[in-house]
Amino acid sequence: MSTHVPRRVALVTLGCSRNEVDSEELAGRLAAQGWELVADAADADAVLVNTCGFVDAAKKDSIDALLAADDLRAGDGEPAGAGPRAVVAVGCLAERYGNELAASLPEADAVLGFDAYPSIGEHLDAVLGGATVPAHTPRDRRTLLPITPVERGASANVAVHVPGHARGVAGGSAAGSPGRRRLTAGPVAALKISSGCDRRCAFCAIPSFRGSHVSRPADDVLAEAEWLAGEGARELVLVSENSTSYGKDLGDLRALEKLLPQLAAVPGIVRVRTVYLQPAELRPSLLEVLLTTPGLAPYLDLSFQHASPAVLRRMRRFGGSEHFLDLLDRGRGLLPGLGARSNVIVGFPGETEADVDILAEFLEAAELDAVGVFGYSDEEGTEAVSLPGKIAEEEIERRRVQITDLVEQLTATRAQERIGSRVQVLVEEITDGIAAGCAGHQQPDADGSCLVRLPGPAGAAAGPPAGGPSGTGQPGLPGQPGQPGVEVGDLIEARVVATEGVDLVAEFTAVLDRARPSAGRGEAAPSATGARATVLVGRPRADGT
């Protein structure tokens, strides 16, 4: 009889939803290589911290997470289970800084780049065995694949590893796993359709460590969508660095227009949401598909970054207030009431008070549902570092507060305008008769939420009442004979009756589509993501692309 004790690993994820997908790839690989995933870093033999390297605050959070993991480390002579014996950094911060990070942070036993992911278990074994694993040496990943987009596919995941694009990796929790293992059991799942970016925005360092744009083949994306549906996912959030570029390296500039209806038709999936859209590339045919295809979220996530044409030109971007408002008008002509979000940067070198006024006037006219406001800061390796016209940090902060205050007023007003309307809410949690989730115009974990008051005692229970069938897929009213109560994963309709900032408060009206039981669904693999009591100290939404 074997007495082998599986090695235990805790995964800690910081940063954006793309990093969450990468962590689930790492989880799948580790499970396939014999590792046991544990939720509490204190119970692990090794802690793997998937870092974020986007902005200074995210970098600090990543370093703090590594230091917190080191604080849990077992002392010399302590027995197994007394704490982790290895702390390893992966992710964007590790990829971007590599051996520099290793030299400045001896608390990390290893600093590994993306190309180490396929053999991640072997690297952890080596660290636990006392070996010194060479730190990653950073390279500009834009130089590692062919310049011509259509020539990249053959090299991706052969010459270099593209995180989140794994194919045929065993170890998922169901047969047919595409190489990832879910770390959360909720009804919303991120699905990576591409990685990298070919744009050269003056402020952005992401392409240098995420690389050139590489699309996943449509068959891979569809197979993973079907697997996620089998794992209990009901909404797919399509993530990338630039979703509008999807397919250009596959030889089909309209590949996304073809893929989206196929994803919306996957059995069990009730909503597909595309994020990280580049306004300059949002062609009319894609806009029409996004806003008229049944099953796609009524939603546009548009990376405006500013509204002054002069500032945008210095950013190496295109457009301005007039172009952006026209884009929103065309979208609302196709789908009145759509949700729209964006990010903006204030304090970019050369920005004037007049430019700030242009941005404010644009935001007042745009009627956006959510806006992320960032103050500019230099990112090493970017063109903007050397631009003239730098603005003092105090003035950048003043402008950030000014625009943030305006945005909070505008988005709260926008939410109030939805009072009396009916929204479709995907239930993510039920507590004391209140169902919490997101309406179609709200991106999960980004744009606020919707709290739905359920009718009577039937709604207070997460499970069906005695004698009521579950997972029928049929609409109905909770509490009626033969009808179950509302459950997590149900798509329900509700009438908005009040607001709290950007959050909506609504009254239940009907179940539109019930969560279906799945033979492939099981317990999600444990993860230290979100476990503030152990390691994770913060997760900013790092998506300024």
Curated annotation (Swiss-Prot):
Do the record's keywords include Zinc?
no
User: Can you cite an annotated GO cellular component?
Assistant: cytosol
- In this chain the Radical SAM core domain maps to 183-414
The record's annotation in CDD domains points to: Radical_SAM
Into which family does the record put it?
A: Belongs to the methylthiotransferase family. RimO subfamily.
Per the UniProt entry, the Enzyme Commission number(s) are 2.8.4.4
Domain MTTase N-terminal residues, every copy = 7-129
Residue segments, region Disordered: 454-486, 516-545
The job of this chain, per UniProt, is described as:
Catalyzes the methylthiolation of an aspartic acid residue of ribosomal protein uS12.
Organism per entry: Frankia alni (strain DSM 45986 / CECT 9034 / ACN14a)
State the Gene3D superfamilies in the record: Methylthiotransferase, N-terminal domain, Nucleic acid-binding proteins, tm_1862 like domain
Q: What is this protein called?
A: Ribosomal protein uS12 methylthiotransferase RimO
